[in-house]
Curated annotation (Swiss-Prot):
The lineage of its organism: Eukaryota, Metazoa, Chordata, Craniata, Vertebrata. One of its GO terms (cellular component) is cortical cytoskeleton. It is found in: Cell membrane. It is a single-pass type III membrane protein. This is Glycophorin-C. Residues 47-95 are cytoplasmic. Belongs to the glycophorin-C family. The modification Phosphoserine is found at S71, S78, S89. Its main location: membrane. The gene is Gypc. It comes from the Eukaryota. Keywords: Cell membrane, Membrane, Phosphoprotein, Transmembrane, Transmembrane helix. Signal peptide: none annotated. It comes from Mus musculus (Mouse). Residues 1-25 are extracellular.
Length: 95
C-alpha cells in the first residue's frame, strides 16, 4: 500500500481573528486621547489662572469723598451728583 501524499493546509487570506486592532488604529486612538487630555489640561490651567487673578475683586460705584462723612445721610447730601436746585426737604434717598 502506498501512503497518501499530504498537502499543506491552504493559507488563509483573512486576518487573524484574535487581532482586533492594527497598529495604525491604535496610533489614531492614542492621538485622539492625548489631544483630548491636552485640551482638558489647558482649560483647567485657564480656569485656575482666571480664578487666581480675579480673587477678591470687588468694584463699587460709590461717590468720591463719601468715606469721610459722618453718616450715610450726610454723605448723600454732600454728593454733587444728587444736588439740584429744588427744596432739600422733599428729596428722597434710596440706599
Amino acid at each position: 500500500m502506498s501512503s497518501p501524499v499530504s498537502k499543506p493546509p491552504p493559507e488563509l487570506l483573512e486576518p487573524n481573528p484574535g487581532k482586533s486592532y492594527g497598529i495604525m488604529e491604535i496610533a489614531i486612538i492614542a492621538a485622539v486621547i492625548t489631544a483630548v487630555a491636552l485640551v482638558l489640561v489647558c482649560l483647567l490651567f485657564l480656569m485656575l489662572r482666571y480664578l487666581y487673578r480675579h480673587k477678591g475683586t470687588y468694584h463699587t460705584n460709590e461717590a468720591k469723598g463719601t468715606e469721610f462723612a459722618e453718616s450715610a445721610d450726610a454723605a448723600l447730601q454732600s454728593d454733587p451728583a444728587l444736588q439740584d436746585a429744588g427744596d432739600t426737604s422733599k428729596k428722597e434717598y434710596f440706599i
